[in-house]
From Swiss-Prot:
Localization per Swiss-Prot or TrEMBL: Cell inner membrane
Protein name: Aromatic amino acid exporter YddG
Keyword Cell inner membrane: yes
Catalysis: reaction(s): L-threonine(in) = L-threonine(out); L-methionine(in) = L-methionine(out); L-lysine(in) = L-lysine(out); L-glutamate(out) = L-glutamate(in)
GO cellular component, one term: plasma membrane
Entry remark concerning the domains of this protein: The overall structure is basket-shaped, with a large substrate-binding cavity at the center of the molecule, and is composed of inverted structural repeats related by two-fold pseudo-symmetry. The central cavity functions as the binding site for a wide range of substrates.
Function comment: Amino acid transporter with broad substrate specificity. Can transport various amino acids, including L-threonine, L-methionine, L-lysine and L-glutamate.
Stretches in topological domain Periplasmic: 25-31, 87-90, 140-149, 199-208, 259-264
Listed GO biological process terms: amino acid transport
Length: 287
């Protein structure tokens, strides 16, 4: 598989993640850890079924413990700290801090062998971050980082660091088959179910809400993690980091099309910054 093909496959994860908000809005009052448990169970099943269809047996899950620490720590760790951040701090501020992960991916990629971090990559990532600031700030009517929410900000920062480290470190585990991600998903589902039992009331999906849960499990919480794994292991990590800032903008555009949000000047500015950042990272970095 070529580097450009792997990058394109990795970008499909970003496209799928942009549907998260719209799909999640159709799951009703299902609490976050229960929703995570349900969707990751489906996502894990999708991976196992796809592997078996290609002749890859369950023996592929026999991996050294560092592989499991990396995978479960990345998937479950990110979601645990993200949900904690949303409970401990206002969603806008928590979301902004959490969305430092694309920039961190770009910066951390400099530590990978054979990768060279160019100023254009950093500039593109900063433009993407600026677009996210404009978009999230407009939604919330501004930001107000208050001292009493420091635990929430720290939790959001933790999830940003965890996901960026997981993503970049995937290159270190390039020989581990992508099918192993199914095991990460199922382990994340089990730990999320435990957190649900300990911390949340049980509100199960009803009627058409199950369709949204299944769609999440197949797409943004299923296929996306497998394609992201391919992109991180074989694609352009720096470019995928910059392109990740497209997710919140595409997510908002989908909400506008579906009638859940209104178009705004902030959305247009965010689009311009993120598209411009991607262009800077793609074109100037080649010179």
């Amino acid at each position: 598989m070529s580097r450009s093909s792997a990058t394109l496959i990795g970008f499909t994860a970003i496209l799928l993640w942009s549907t998260l908000a719209l799909a999640t809005s159709s799951t009703g009052a299902v609490p976050p850890f229960l929703l995570t448990a349900l969707t990751f169970t489906i996502g894990g099943a999708v991976g196992i079924a796809a592997g078996l269809a290609r002749g890859v047996g369950l023996s592929v899950l026999r991996q050294p413990w560092p592989v499991w620490v990396h995978g479960i720590g990345g998937l479950f760790g990110y979601h645990f700290f993200y949900f904690s951040a949303l409970k401990l701090a206002p969603p806008a501020e928590a979301g902004l801090v959490a969305y430092l992960w694309p920039l961190l991916i770009v910066l951390f990629s400099a530590f990978l062998p054979g990768e060279r971090l160019r100023p254009a990559h950093v500039a593109g990532a900063l433009m993407g971050l600026a677009g996210t600031v404009v978009l999230l700030g407009a939604r919330a009517g501004g930001f107000g980082f208050a001292p009493e929410y420091v635990p929430g900000y720290l939790a959001a920062a933790a999830c940003a660091v965890i996901w960026s480290v997981y993503s970049v470190a995937s290159r270190r585990f390039a020989r581990v088959p992508t099918e192993v991600v199914a095991g990460f998903c199922l382990a994340t589902a089990a730990l999320s179910a435990l957190c649900h039992i300990l911390f949340e009331p049980s509100v199960w999906p009803v009627g058409s809400e199950w369709l949204a849960v299944v769609a999440l499990g197949i797409g943004p919480v299923g296929i996306a993690f497998y394609t992201w794994d391919i992109g991180m292991k074989r694609g352009d990590v720096r470019l995928l980091g910059v392109l990740s800032y497209a997710a919140p903008v595409l997510s908002t555009l989908l909400l506008v099309v579906a009638g859940f949000a209104a178009p705004s000047g902030a959305l247009a500015i965010a689009c311009a910054l993120i598209v411009g950042g991607a262009a800077v990272a793609t074109l100037l970095a080649r010179r």
